[in-house]
């Protein structure tokens, strides 16, 4: 299962002329703003390609272009003189570019490493998604410091800032909000999804105690998830992944309540028959009653086996349908809500 990793890079751009006349405070700010805008465009190209199923090689190439743009912008800004000896605004912009570059390198590598083990447990998945959110928050905090420096510079030099969100900024905000929404739905899905894997493992090992313990946990997680889903509002009117998650959780509830009884009956019958067979094979001259009891045991295990196999076939079909529906909903959700940007 592939996850979309994105970073929030959201700067407020002010409209200035971009001639490199650093004697004019508006032009000074405009030059820095242009560098930030260039980075944001590369970011959106990378994010759009990641979300819309572009080949991994192309996505990685776009990430490298983003890194190059960050470095170039940082060098362009650091090469600026201070404005009338005041270097604070310039240095704040350079610091943010350094932060952004480090995030794309160091934090990105950590997240990729965490992704490799994220599916091993719910805790690992939660930590992976939380790491993504912390990285975005780190950038957001850096962005707030950058905006504060911009306001201080503007006030000090009598520049009138217009607080308006750009189209590019709107796109990046939507990506951020979309990811947060997806994370909360995904964790609701993943907890019982992983728990069912433990249940199926116990079934494969004929572990009756493990089956009972894991099915009870699965039922609890699925029911808890259904309650949580009821409190989550649709994303921009789109309830598709919540609905797909609900379908998946309802499958788990039905699996435990309606189907696990057949599984437990099979293993108990199998266990009883093993005892009957062992005792029967000890007898060199069994009585008619003993033969009848053995034959009944054979009939019981055959009946239980047939029911078990049919039960598994039904579950496998329903599980596959629900998972396909879930995966399709996730793909459609990202395709529909991630802005297309070249």
Name each model feature, range by range:
Residues 1-27, 342:
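Bacterial Sec-dependent N-terminal signal peptides
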Residues 21-54, 115-211, 215, 270-342:
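C-terminal amphipathic alpha-helix
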Residues 38, 110, 188-191, 195, ...:
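Interface faces of extended alpha-helical assemblies
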Residues 43, 47, 74-77, 101-108, ...:
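A structural signal for well-ordered alpha-helices, especially hydrophobic packing surfaces
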Residues 47-130:
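Post-signal peptide N-terminal segment of secreted/secretory-pathway proteins
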Residues 67, 94-97, 101, 219, ...:
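Generic structural concept
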Residues 73-94, 113-114, 225-247, 261-270:
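Short, solvent-exposed, charged loop/turn and helix-capping segments
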């Amino acid at each position: 299962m592939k996850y979309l990793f994105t970073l929030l890079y959201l700067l407020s751009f002010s409209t200035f002329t971009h001639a490199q006349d650093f004697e004019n405070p508006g032009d000074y700010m405009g030059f820095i703003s242009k560098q930030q805008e260039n980075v944001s465009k590369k970011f959106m190209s990378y994010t759009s390609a990641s979300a819309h199923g572009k080949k991994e090689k192309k996505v990685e190439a776009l990430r490298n272009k983003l890194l190059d743009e960050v470095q170039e912008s940082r060098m362009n800004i650091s090469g600026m003189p201070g404005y009338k000896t005041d270097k604070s605004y310039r240095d704040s912009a350079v610091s943010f570019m350094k932060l952004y570059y480090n995030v794309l390198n160091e934090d990105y590598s950590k997240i990729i490493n965490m992704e490799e083990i994220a599916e091993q447990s719910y805790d690992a998945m939660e930590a992976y998604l939380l790491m993504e959110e912390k990285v975005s928050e780190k950038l957001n905090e850096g962005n707030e410091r950058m905006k504060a420096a911009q306001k201080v510079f503007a006030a000090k030099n009598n520049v009138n800032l217009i607080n308006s969100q750009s189209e590019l900024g709107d796109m990046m905000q939507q990506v951020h909000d979309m990811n947060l929404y997806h994370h909360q739905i995904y964790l609701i899905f993943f907890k019982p999804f992983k728990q069912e894997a433990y249940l199926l493992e116990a079934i494969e090992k004929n572990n009756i105690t493990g089956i009972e313990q894991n099915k009870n946990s699965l039922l609890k997680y699925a029911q808890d998830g259904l309650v949580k889903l009821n409190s989550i509002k649709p994303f921009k009117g789109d309830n598709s992944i919540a609905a797909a998650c609900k379908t998946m959780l309802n499958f788990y509830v039905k699996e435990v309540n309606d189907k696990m009884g057949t599984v437990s009956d099979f293993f108990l019958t199998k266990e009883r028959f093993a005892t009957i067979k062992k005792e029967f094979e000890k007898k060199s001259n069994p009585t008619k009653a003993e033969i009848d009891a053995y034959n009944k045991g054979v009939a019981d295990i055959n009946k239980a086996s047939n029911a078990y196999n049919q039960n598994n076939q039904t579950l496998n079909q329903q599980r596959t349908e629900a998972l396909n529906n879930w995966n399709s909903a996730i793909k459609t959700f990202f395709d529909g809500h991630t802005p297309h940007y070249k």
